[in-house]
Amino acid sequence: MTQDVGFVGLGNIGRPMAVNVLKRFGRLAAFDIDTARVRTLAEAGAVATGSLAELALKTRVILLSLPTSAEVERVLHGDGGVAGSAAPGTLVIDLTSGSPPRSQDIAKRLADRGIRYIDAGVSGGVAGAEAATLGIMIGGSNADVADAMPYLQAIGKTIVHMGPVGAGHMTKSLNNLLLAANMVVASEALALAAKAGLAPEKVVAAINGSSGRSYITEYRFPNFVLKGDFSSRGGMAMSLLVKDVAIACDTAKSSGVTMFVGNLVHQMLMRISDELGSTAPNQSVARAIEGWAGVQIRSSKDA
């Protein structure tokens, strides 16, 4: 049985997720600090709310899509936040790529008020959000995850319950560590290919029929890098990828797990973010490596 649902955070990936929830259930209360985003969604049939407190009073399930755990804490526990107005039993579904320890602390503070919480990191970018095919990694109790499932099924395709609160966000950070590492090494390999006089699109095609293939070579390079498309549709901002990789590296350090490659990738991402700007989409890793190598990784058809 579904209940009145709210959505906070209507950014690049939040808005298409909110649209799909609205399509599935026919009702949605929305809030964003950018009121223009709320108005746009209201034109599609959502109920615009003027404050977090108003949204909390209208709903019993609240989905959050925010940049970091810091924003989640402010939205939930700050002045005028959700926790001050939400009824006991309200379920918060945190779609943010958050810090596992902070997610656990957030959950505990909400539980003290009788409010339920699950962390549900999402992967698949804007395209996956629009198509409702996101991968979703969940942390929370069995009962809370079961109650959240109808809403998660409205936005995602591959939905995996990883364990207790924090497990979803931990898994998301590991996913993005692998994403970043693949982006770095694939960009280096393709830059070398271009420098050696090989046609990048042919190298990508060969790799995608061989053991070196990955999501990066199968999707990001053909659809974005080879076309010279470094728009935000290609992936999250560099600042967010840096944050997620830092979560994995920090957790490895505190757990006594050696992570040579992960730490090197993190250092490279920070350098690239400094060079190209923190808001640059993460396929800009390839653009930075192109610059260092003095080549362009482009399809001959798009050159």
Label each region the model flagged.
Residues 1-64, 90, 96, 161:
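NAD(P)+-binding Rossmann beta1-loop-alpha1 motif at the extreme N-terminus of oxidoreductases
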Residues 5, 10, 97-177:
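Rossmann-fold dinucleotide-binding core
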Residues 28, 48, 117-118, 159, ...:
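Hydrophobic beta-strand scaffold residues
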Residues 52-64, 68-117:
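Rossmann-fold NAD(P) dinucleotide-binding segment
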Residues 167-293:
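Helical "substrate-binding/catalytic lid" subdomain
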